[in-house]
Regions:
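Serine-dependent acyl-ester chemistry module
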Residues: 517-531, 685-789, 794-809, 841-844, ...
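Membrane/wall-proximal cationic-aromatic binding patches
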Residues: 516-644, 800-802
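Generic structural signal for small/hydrophobic residues in well-ordered secondary structure
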Residues: 150, 183, 341, 615, ...
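Internal alpha/beta domain cores that form substrate/cofactor-binding pockets in large enzymes
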Residues: 609-611, 636, 641, 647-675, ...
Length: 853
């Protein structure tokens, strides 16, 4: 066998070695994503082997075959991500591209595309058969994200295109591989897409892609830290420290967008598309115009091409001055930005919100850019490139103050956007006045420390001591070292033995390892039943998340057709004999107005009747009614008949999603006791506190009459008749006010039960997510025992099972049918174990009224 010349072998090794290092880095990066569950909900990891293997094959192919291979690989990614819906997406996409190239007048093609968009919009709103039927909501969002902006750019450039472009390139522009899992996608420019394809040496582009992906992972981890540990609910904001954290974290959550966009561009670089960065050191912007140039650069370029330049040229043609033309064109850009964000929201979620809060946000930002532009065009303006200017203390101080001011401004604006309520926002800022002198001093020292660090960093940057931060090009060996070292450190930090050795810092690292709701949003999941605006308005920040079919059905029950409003402290109740769709399952009520089977109002002889009260988990939100823990427990009681004195067992489920302690009391007094139960079982979760706090705050702010004893508790907490809802929430959350309300509710329920000869029993069910943010078992069970109730402790019911396997939906902490089966098994065991507390006689036991041990 003829051996290859040494020179050839060496040349091949020189090519293969960098490719091998790149593959190794990719495997490490995707391992980091797996260990920390980064972008788990997007499905990125399902494409990991396709991306890594596809890169290896793509890089080895002759250049002429790479683009067709990338297109085929992208279509494969769409199939993996969307299943059979990918066929419809591909067919519709090819049809749209074909319309762009019809041999008819350009205006006719634009009209056809616009007509297609209108039909698609109607399909989204009305559900036209054949368009949305059988096609997932996510597939619709992905398809829309492929074309809603890119086809505008494509048609704009197509009109001036003179060079023949292969069909594989044209289709690849729309069917970009990462778009299969990221519907919220950067607006890639058609010209840049073509121009940057292998515009640098391949290995340099590939390694840049790896570095961008790693940087994206870092951004996502930083976002997760901000989201889990810094973001706060408005009612938890009080004083200078929490106000500062609330403002800053509102702007810092943009790291999520930045991380995703870095990932997208990094993946595309692996296949030769050397696209520019989408976001660049945006937290260091020194002016509104500087921020506009740094943040979401693709959007800025899109607006310049489609709106700014045409508007500017049209104004110039009308003999309007250059200064006025630039200012007016900038105004056009920001009006268009406001409208197009709603347009984007429509395609991704299905609603077209035009709120004045958004108008103010974009209006203020646009006005700042206009003023900044006017100042730069003024006769005294002087632009000095920081790179060419020498360093001076005065220049450094000015620049750092501008950066700090811009960060503060954007933090304030994003907090305005996330709060959604001007009165609440102003109240939060006003709470700074109540700060202690020591807190103000510490805050001032912190600001000074940041300022000094900024001046030092400014000096270091001018001396070239950047450690590669912000550089778009690094030597291959240095880039590989940084990526490998960073990935290995992250993987090491995920090891349990390392985390244990780090103490509290290790616990913080552990908290970053999974995708979950933070304290604020976990509370919102409960509070949403009361605060319709939280769930029906658009998101609290511009980080769009596409909802699939199950998630889109997460409508608070108080906003559904299943309830009627009572006009008093109960707020709402279920309508009798009604079937509606809610949280992925049919919600059917019986003639008694409860979500349960039909039962006679009068208890029949030989029947043992349990009444059940609680909130959404107890009502079995998201689960099939006949497979809820209540129904399963009832079936087993009737099958096994633990007490031979009873021939029939009934569990009447009076629970209603969104109810709090005060509504448990009203439900007991108005409904439960009317049906002569033997036992009242109170289903309790730690989340009951957040629901109760928001519900009572809503009622108190509207001066709805409350129980005199409850009103007295509110007055003791300093809650007057004229207090606003945010102030009421804050005062309810301070001290032991919620504990007093809970104790009052349990005591009142127990008293009413004893008056009617009913046994009150307390049942604690742990949250699927976590109890770490709310009072838990000890406090709640202590109050229940003090009220004379027996206590069923169901903690540990989910042990041994992955929590994600038991959740109704990744964004919904309600248990699914598997979770309900676990609860039913445990509840039945507890009923047998504490049979005397239930007034049951099983195998020689004698009944007793309560079990407070």
């Amino acid at each position: 066998m003829e051996s290859r010349p040494p020179a050839v072998a060496t040349s091949q090794l020189a090519v293969l070695a960098p490719h091998g290092l790149i593959v190794f880095q990719l495997l490490l990066i995707f391992t980091v994503f797996r260990e920390f569950q980064l972008e788990q909900s997007s499905g990125l990891l399902s494409l990991a082997f396709l991306i890594v293997g596809g890169f290896a094959v793509h890089a080895a192919l002759p250049v002429a075959y790479r683009m067709p291979f990338f297109l085929a690989l992208s279509l494969g990614a769409f199939v993996i991500a969307l299943g059979t819906a990918a066929i419809a997406v591909a067919a519709a996409g090819i049809l749209l591209v074909a319309i762009c190239h019809l041999p008819v007048d350009f205006r006719i093609r634009v009209g056809l595309i616009a007509s297609t968009a209108v039909l698609a919009a109607i399909a989204v709103l009305e559900g036209i058969p054949g368009v949305t039927a059988g096609t997932s909501r996510r597939a619709v969002a992905v398809f829309a994200s492929m074309f809603m902006f890119r086809i505008i750019i494509y048609m704009y450039d197509l009109r001036h295109e003179r060079v023949r472009v292969p069909i594989a390139t044209r289709l690849s522009y729309f069917f970009l591989l990462p778009n299969a899992v990221f519907p919220f996608f950067p607006v890639v420019d058609w010209g840049a897409f073509k121009r940057t394809y292998y515009d640098r040496p391949p290995v340099e582009i590939y390694q840049r892609g790896v570095r961008l992906m790693f940087r994206g992972a870092i951004h996502l981890l930083l976002y997760r830290y901000v989201y889990y540990h810094l973001t706060k609910s408005p009612d938890a904001v009080y004083g200078i420290r929490t106000v500062a954290v609330y403002l800053a974290s509102s702007w810092l959550v943009y790291l999520h967008v930045s991380g995703i966009f870095h990932l997208v561009v990094g993946i595309l670089c692996l296949f030769g598309f050397n696209l520019p960065e989408t976001n660049r050191l945006y937290f260091l912007a020194s002016s509104p115009n500087d921020l506009w140039r740094r943040v979401n650069v693709y959007w800025k370029d899109f607006m310049l091409k489609i709106f700014y330049m045409p508007s500017y040229k049209a104004l110039q043609n009308r003999k309007i001055s250059m200064r006025s033309s630039m200012i007016l064109a900038t105004i056009v850009v920001f009006v268009a930005t406001w409208l197009l964000h709603s347009y984007q929201w429509f395609w991704l979620v299905g609603r077209f919100p035009l709120t004045w809060v958004d108008a103010v946000f974009w209006g203020v930002f646009g006005a700042l850019v206009v003023v900044n532009t006017a100042m730069q065009l003024g006769p005294r303006s002087r632009v000095v490139s920081p790179r060419n200017a020498g360093w001076s203390p005065g220049g450094a101080v000015t620049h750092v103050l501008k950066v700090m001011g811009m960060f503060t401004l954007m933090s304030a604006m994003f907090s305005w956007w996330s709060t959604r309520d001007p009165a609440t926002w102003i109240y939060l800022l006003g709470s700074v006045r109540e700060s202690a002198p020591r807190a103000l001093l510490l805050f001032a020292l912190g600001v000074i420390a940041v300022f000094v660090a900024g001046v030092a960093a400014h000096y270091a940057a001018h001396r070239g001591w950047t450690l590669g931060i912000g550089k778009s090009v690094l030597p291959f060996s240095r880039s590989v070292f940084l990526t490998l070292a960073g990935s290995i450190l992250l993987l090491a930090s995920s090891r349990p033995e390392v985390q244990q050795s780090l103490g509290t810092k290790g616990l913080m690292l552990l908290s970053l390892e999974r995708e979950r709701l933070n304290a604020r949003d976990a509370a919102i999941e409960d509070r949403a039943y009361y605060e319709a605006l939280i769930t029906t308005d658009q998101p609290a920040n511009p980080v769009f998340e596409v909802r699939d079919e199950a998630e889109a059905d997460l409508v608070p029950i108080r906003n559904s057709a299943a309830v009627r409003y009572t006009g008093d402290a109960l707020i709402y109740e279920l309508l009798p004999s009604r079937t509606t769709r809610n949280r992925g399952s049919d919600l059917t009520t019986n003639a008694l107005g409860i979500r349960d089977r039909e039962y006679p109002a009068v208890k029949r002889p030989g029947t043992y009747r349990i009444a059940l009260i609680g909130a959404s988990v107890i009502m079995a939100s998201g689960a099939d009614q006949n497979r809820s823990f209540e129904a399963l427990t009832e079936d087993r009681l009737n099958a096994e008949r633990p007490d031979e004195r009873f021939s029939n067992y009934e569990i009447l489920n009076f629970a209603v999603a969104g109810y709090g302690f005060h509504q448990f009391v009203l439900t007991t007094e108005r409904k439960v006791l009317r049906y002569d139960p033997d036992v009242l079982l109170i289903g309790a979760l730690a989340g009951d506190h957040a629901v109760t706090r928001t519900g009572i705050a809503e009622l108190a702010a509207k001066d709805v009459p409350l129980d005199p004893e409850l009103t007295a508790i509110l007055r003791q907490a300093g809650i007057g008749e004229s207090a606003g809802i945010v102030e009421i929430k804050r005062k309810l959350g301070s001290g032991n006010t919620m504990g007093k309300i809970r104790a009052w509710a349990y005591q009142r329920i127990a008293e009413r039960c004893r008056e009617r000869g009913v046994i009150p029993v307390f049942m604690y069910i742990p949250r699927l997510e976590s109890d770490e943010y709310s009072p838990g078992f000890d406090e709640m069970a202590g109050d229940a025992r003090a009220a004379g109730m027996a206590v069923l402790d169901l903690r540990g019911v989910y042990d041994g099972r992955p929590r994600a396997e038991l959740m109704f939906h990744r964004r919904d902490v309600h248990p699914n049918e598997i979770g309900h089966r676990l609860i039913a098994d445990r509840l039945y065991s507890e009923i047998l174990r504490q049979a005397p507390a239930f007034g049951l006689q099983t195998r020689g036991q004698t009944p007793r009224a309560t079990d407070n041990q």
